């Protein structure tokens, strides 16, 4: 019989499909198993409606057979099968799906889920095969038919000899090449692992005869050398029932923990398990996990976020990044949905309304679980925060604060009050009477923040100080701007304003009286500071650095640490303590030794920078200046 040409621009489509659509050749097995499952679904559904088959779910199966000698991989099902016309229509026209037609005809009825919404999955077999033979017999038909093809040239359909309804697909696996080791698809271990990965939750048993060995009876004992014999045993490769579809009462915490550790390669139990399912505009089940600790590569560019995505129990994407916002990228888990729109390959999802709906609901669910943990299990939440708090704070700052309102109440900060982190709400709730701002300081550690000269004035007032020790912290607070109408105030910014009206008046008078001194020091530090002024925030320290404008000293350090970026310098102000003995020395130098005043100004400036955590440009020069006045 002459070969028939494929329809629907077959050569172009098949070439595109084999070489472009699928990025991993191994998914051919997933596609063929899904097709077999669809065929069984159709027969089961027909029997359910018409009561004609006399078959129950227990009667159905999918079988895989491997033959290394003939280099064939065979997949057999006892599903609905196909007539000659169905073989011609479904396999002769690329991108036509019998499953899609069946689904459309029955979409208003309650019944089984049909996976294969596009008729291209079958042709993925040609990625690994030099020839494909399909033997099929429709349920209730008296004759069988065989469809066979070697690829782009075309196909032929001839009478077949298959007994019993169903379909048998035999692939002749290609020879190995320089880059492709096709023989892997003839190895039982490799094939069983692919089934486990992609098709573990197909609802029908996927069986394969496994070659095994055992100790020969009468050997290995009484001084006899052990001898082994080979035997074959048929095994079911898939678990069939997804753990996320089982009732909560049927699943123990231990089961979920073990599933997580096996599935996501963690040696620790998860910190939190989140189970959720929704019906309606987007129907899905999700099983999510918050790890106990961050992966080694979590805060690197190499880390890939995403949830496993299943369509009716079939894995179609290992890491679907679109299901998680960046702020919750630490979450691991999976989503299973019947409603996702698939494009021509199950590997590449259309960014459609369904996916966005699911992602939005998952985001709210995760945020709700974190809030619940914060309120009801503070110790566990603080454990979570140690691993992933940085990501939440990045989430507040990211995208110009798009998610700041959803995340601000999840944030924790260390403070001057004890060794436990506090929320912004807790800080505001215990603010002192008359306190109008939320005060914070920045440094490499809590101890460094508390040692800042300006912190003394806050302690004297009894005000709590938030201690920001991560690079992103101040950027996050700048995006928030305020919390419960209380503005955030960096204690190292100019104009801390902790003085009484009487103290302010005295400061004005002192500034006027020592105007010449301040101008001389400002000239001595020209190009380094914008201004030298008297401070009302210093107690025991002689001087400190404050900043004016949008860029603080801490932000300057962070921005300048980034590669390939133009250097930025904050507008610095040197503030002097008029009540410190050093100030009297400065006043004397201004009158008696103006040239020495420049040296003192540079030393005070360098000292203030060091206290603020800023590295000196020339430490050796600073040390020499310091020694010269000792």
PLM features: residue spans?
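GHKL (Bergerat-fold) ATPase N-terminal catalytic module, capturing the glycine-rich phosphate-binding loop
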Residues: 1-188, 193, 216
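GHKL/Bergerat-fold ATPase module in large chromosome/replication-associated machines
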Residues: 114, 135-154, 174-630
């Amino acid at each position: 019989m002459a070969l028939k040409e494929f329809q629907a621009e077959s050569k172009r489509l098949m070439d595109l499909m084999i070489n472009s659509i699928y990025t991993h050749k191994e998914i051919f097995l997933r596609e063929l198993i899904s097709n077999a499952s669809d065929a069984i679904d159709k027969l089961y559904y027909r029997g359910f409606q018409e009561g004609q088959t006399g078959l129950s779910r227990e009667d159905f199966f999918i079988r895989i057979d491997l033959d290394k000698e003939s280099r064939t991989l065979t997949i057999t099902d006892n599903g609905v099968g196909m007539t000659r016309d169905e073989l011609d229509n479904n396999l002769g026209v690329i991108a036509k799906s019998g499953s899609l037609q069946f689904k459309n005809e029955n979409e208003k009825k309650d019944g089984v889920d049909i996976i294969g919404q596009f008729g291209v999955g079958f042709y993925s077999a040609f990625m690994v095969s030099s020839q494909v033979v399909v033997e099929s017999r429709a349920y209730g038909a008296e004759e069988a038919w065989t469809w066979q093809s070697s690829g782009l040239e075309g196909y032929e359909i001839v009478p077949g000899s298959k007994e019993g309804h169903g379909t048998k697909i035999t692939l002749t696996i290609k020879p190995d090449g320089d880059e492709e080791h096709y023989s892997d698809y003839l190895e039982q271990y490799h094939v069983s692992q692919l089934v486990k990965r992609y098709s573990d939750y197909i609802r029908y048993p996927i069986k394969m005869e496994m070659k095994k060995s055992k100790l020969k009876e009468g050997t290995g004992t009484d001084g006899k050398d052990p001898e082994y014999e080979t035997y074959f045993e048929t095994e079911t490769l898939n678990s069939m029932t997804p753990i996320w579809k089982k009732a909560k009462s049927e699943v123990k915490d231990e089961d979920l923990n073990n599933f997580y550790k096996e599935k996501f390669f963690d040696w620790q139990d998860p910190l939190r398990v989140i189970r959720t399912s929704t019906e309606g505009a987007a129907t899905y089940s999700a099983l999510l996990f918050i790890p106990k600790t961050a992966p080694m590569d979590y805060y690197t560019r190499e880390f890939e976020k995403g949830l496993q995505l299943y369509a009716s129990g079939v894995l179609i994407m290992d890491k679907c990044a679109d299901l998680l916002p960046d702020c919750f990228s630490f979450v691991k888990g999976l989503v299973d949905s019947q409603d996702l729109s698939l494009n021509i390959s199950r590997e590449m999802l259309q960014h459609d309304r369904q996916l966005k709906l699911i992602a939005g609901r998952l985001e709210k669910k995760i945020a709700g679980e974190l809030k619940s943990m914060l309120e009801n299990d503070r110790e566990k939440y603080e454990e979570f925060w140690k691993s992933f708090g940085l990501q939440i704070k990045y989430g507040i700052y990211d995208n110009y604060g798009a998610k700041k309102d959803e995340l601000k109440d999840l944030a924790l900060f260390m403070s001057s009050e004890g060794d436990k982190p506090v929320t912004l709400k807790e800080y505001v709730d215990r603010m002192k009477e008359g306190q109008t701002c939320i005060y914070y300081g920045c440094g490499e550690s809590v101890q460094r923040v508390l040692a800042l000269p300006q912190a003394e004035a806050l302690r004297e007032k009894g005000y709590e100080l938030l201690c920001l020790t991560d690079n992103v912290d101040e950027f996050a607070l700048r995006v928030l701007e305020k919390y419960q109408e209380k503005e955030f105030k960096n204690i190292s910014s100019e104009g801390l304003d902790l003085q009484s009206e009487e103290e302010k008046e005295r400061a004005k008078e002192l500034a006027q009286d020592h105007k010449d001194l301040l101008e001389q020091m400002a000239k001595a530090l020209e190009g380094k500071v914008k201004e030298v002024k008297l401070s009302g925030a210093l107690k025991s320290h002689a001087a400190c650095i404050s900043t004016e404008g949008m860029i603080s000293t801490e932000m300057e350090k962070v921005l300048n640490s980034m590669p390939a970026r133009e250097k930025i310098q904050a507008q610095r102000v040197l503030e002097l303590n008029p009540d410190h003995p050093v100030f009297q020395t400065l006043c004397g130098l201004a009158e008696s030794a103006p040239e020495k005043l420049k040296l003192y100004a540079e030393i005070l400036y360098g000292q203030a920078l060091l206290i603020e955590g800023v590295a000196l440009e020339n430490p050796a020069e600073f040390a020499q200046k310091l020694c010269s006045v000792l």
